[in-house]
Amino acid sequence: MKYRMKNRHMRYKILALLVVCVLSCTVKAQETDKYAQWGPTTQSGWGYMLRAGYVMGGTTPLPLPEEIRSIHKYNPEGGITLGVDVYKMLHRRWGVMAGLHFFAQGMSTEAEVKNYHMGITQGEDYLEGNFTGTDVTNTFMTGFTLPLMANFRISPRWSVHAGPYLSYLLKTEFDGSVFDGYLREGNPTGPKVNIDRSNPATYDFGNDMRKWLWGVQLGVDWRAARHWALFAALDWGMNGIFHSDFKTVDFALYPLYAKVGVAYHF
C-alpha cells in the first residue's frame, strides 16, 4: 500500500512538473511572438524607417554665464526634421541603427545682459567691448545629421536608442541687435557709448559658425501599429557652434534640440 501511494505521489509530481514546463514554454513562445509581431518586417533582422517630425530648441551656453542676467523671451523657430534610418536587430531586444536626417531649426531670444562682450555695428561704425542692456538674438541652421546608435527594446512596442551623431550645416544664421543700454569700448571701464531702442546696434556672426558639429542623440520609439511609430529624441551638441578662433562671444554656445514626430517602418 505504501509503495502504491509513493508511486502515486511521484506521478503527481511529474505531472505538475510537466504542466509547469508546458506553461513556461507557452508564455515564452507568446512573448517571442509579441516581439516578432512588433519587430523587423524581415526575417534577417534588417529594416529601415522614414521619419518626419517637429524640432524645438536652440543654442545655449552650458552653464548659463553670469553675464546673462535674465531671459525675457524665448521663441523656438519651429523647424522640421526628415530622415531615413537603417537598422539591424542582432537579437530580438537589441541592435544597431544608422541614418541620414535633414533638419531646419532655430530660435529667437531676448535677454537682459551685463558686461556681455560683443562686437556690434552702429551706423557705419564697428564697436567692440562690454555691453549692458537688452540683447535680441536670432539663430537658424539647416543641414544633415548622420547618427550611429545602439538600439534596445524595452518591450515589444517600446525601444530606446542612443549614440553619437555628426552634423554638416548647409546654412548658418546668427544675428541680432542690442539696445536700452550702453557699451564700454575695449573693456568694462572703457569709454561709454549709449545705445537706445530708437537706434539699436546690430551684429551678424553667421559666417563665424562651424560647418561641422557633433554630439549625442538620445531617443525613444513607440510602435502604434505594425508599420507606424511615434518618436521623441534629443540632440545634445558637444562642440560650440563658433570656430575656435572666434573670440567676440567669449563663451561657447551649444546646440540643444528636441524632436517629436512619426515614423514608418518598412
Sequence positions of predicted segments:
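Hydrophobic, lipid-facing positions within transmembrane beta-strands of outer-membrane proteins
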Residues: 46-48, 78-84, 142-148, 214-218, ...
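Outer-membrane beta-barrel strand-turn architecture
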Residues: 88-92, 152-156, 224-226, 266
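Cleavable N-terminal export/targeting peptides
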Residues: 1-43
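Repeated loop/turn-to-beta-strand initiation elements of outer-membrane beta-barrel proteins
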Residues: 93-96, 157-160, 226-232
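Transmembrane beta-barrel strands of outer-membrane/channel proteins
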Residues: 50-56, 98-104, 162-168, 232-236, ...
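Extracellular/periplasm-exposed beta-strand and loop segments of Gram-negative cell-envelope proteins
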Residues: 58-77, 105-141, 169-211, 217, ...
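Outer-membrane beta-barrel "beta-signal"
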Residues: 222-226, 254-266
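Short glycine/proline- and aromatic-enriched beta-strand/turn motifs that initiate or cap beta-hairpins
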Residues: 30-89, 209, 237, 265
